[in-house]
Amino acid sequence: MELARPCSNFQSDLDFCPDCGSVLPLPGVQDTVICPRCGFSIDVRDFGGKVVKTSVVFNKLGTVIPMSVDEGPESQGPVVDRRCSRCGHEGMAYYTRQMRSADEGQTVFYTCINCKFQEKEDS
């Protein structure tokens, strides 16, 4: 005597388990498709005529604007009151990098906005 299966919790497409709502695997060589989450099984014949389509959408590449040699990351950024040791100009742009191990401070690179001379300071 076969037991009647209780009503499903979900009314769903064949892509989803009607008991738990999980995505069902694609039919294979077995006679049934078994839900990997709850164990619900469905006969492969129920998938007859179902067509599976896949597509891959690639994002368009953005326009790349090359930076000139004078416009590197070291000549941009915030300017601090620091005197250039080469030309004496007051005001240098800076940026930081983690050059050493993580438990040590950052390295600060200063660039004179007048003569483009670079200095570095380990902090």
Curated annotation (Swiss-Prot):
UniProt keyword Heme present: no
Entry's Gene Ontology BP terms: termination of RNA polymerase I transcription
Keywords from the named record: DNA-directed RNA polymerase, Metal-binding, Nucleus, Transcription, Zinc, Zinc-finger
Intracellular or extracellular location(s): Nucleus, Nucleolus
Short motif (Hairpin): ranges: 103-104
Zinc finger (C4-type): 17-38
Pfam family membership, one: Zn_ribbon_TFIIS
Stored InterPro entries: DNA-dir_RNA_pol-M_15_CS, Rpa12/Rpb9/Rpc10/TFS, Zn_ribbon_RPA12_C, Znf_TFIIS
Residues reported to bind Zn(2+) 2: C84, C87, C112, C115
GO molecular function: DNA-directed RNA polymerase activity; nucleic acid binding; zinc ion binding
Quaternary structure and interacting proteins, as annotated: Component of the RNA polymerase I (Pol I) complex consisting of 13 subunits: a ten-subunit catalytic core composed of POLR1A/RPA1, POLR1B/RPA2, POLR1C/RPAC1, POLR1D/RPAC2, POLR1H/RPA12, POLR2E/RPABC1, POLR2F/RPABC2, POLR2H/RPABC3, POLR2K/RPABC4 and POLR2L/RPABC5; a mobile stalk subunit POLR1F/RPA43 protruding from the core and additional subunits homologous to general transcription factors POLR1E/RPA49 and POLR1G/RPA34. Part of Pol I pre-initiation complex (PIC), in which Pol I core assembles with RRN3 and promoter-bound UTBF and SL1/TIF-IB complex.
Chain's role: Core component of RNA polymerase I (Pol I), a DNA-dependent RNA polymerase which synthesizes ribosomal RNA precursors using the four ribonucleoside triphosphates as substrates. Can mediate Pol I proofreading of the nascent RNA transcript. Anchors into the Pol I active site to monitor transcription fidelity and cleave mis-incorporated 5'-ribonucleotides.
Protein's UniProt name: DNA-directed RNA polymerase I subunit RPA12
Lineage of the organism: Eukaryota, Metazoa, Chordata, Craniata, Vertebrata
Gene: Polr1h
